[in-house]
Amino acid sequence: MTGNEVWFDAAKYLHQNKIAKPVMWLGDDRHYKKAKDIFSDDVLFMDTFVHYQENINQINYIDEKSEFFFSGNYLRAKDRCLKMMDRLDLYGSFSRQDREVVFNKISLFLLKKLSKEKPDALVMAEIAHSHAQYLVLEICMFLNIEIVKFNTWILGPLLYLESLQTGKRFEVDFEV
């Protein structure tokens, strides 16, 4: 959840130049209002997924990609996400069962949303470091959705996309 303006500007540029259209924006909440103005209903409030899952309503999940719950992706995501949720439990009042309910609720929401929207790729500005971000990553891997991450090179003003699955860098003919 980087608050850097450059990541918002990159998404805005891709959208305005009809290179990419977000089907789900789950970015830093500092950009929420600006992103909502540009990307409309495709913008989700990150705090809802990380801290206030009770605000996720009307999932209307039937059985979209229910085989996810029997996959290695589910088991890996559950193990890692439940551990990531430990960081949110300041007072020790969040039981294992509570964590599993939250994890499965977010899973159902994401499976419904990603099955309906059928995105071409998951584009990340950074490696997932919250349970919600990591769950999106695992579900996209399960659905065979291309996952790319922006990388920067410290020695020069270089920004490039790299596939998380293959490590391949994408060549783009682009002048600044």
Tell me what each language-model feature is.
Residues M1-Q16:
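Charged, amphipathic alpha-helical stretches
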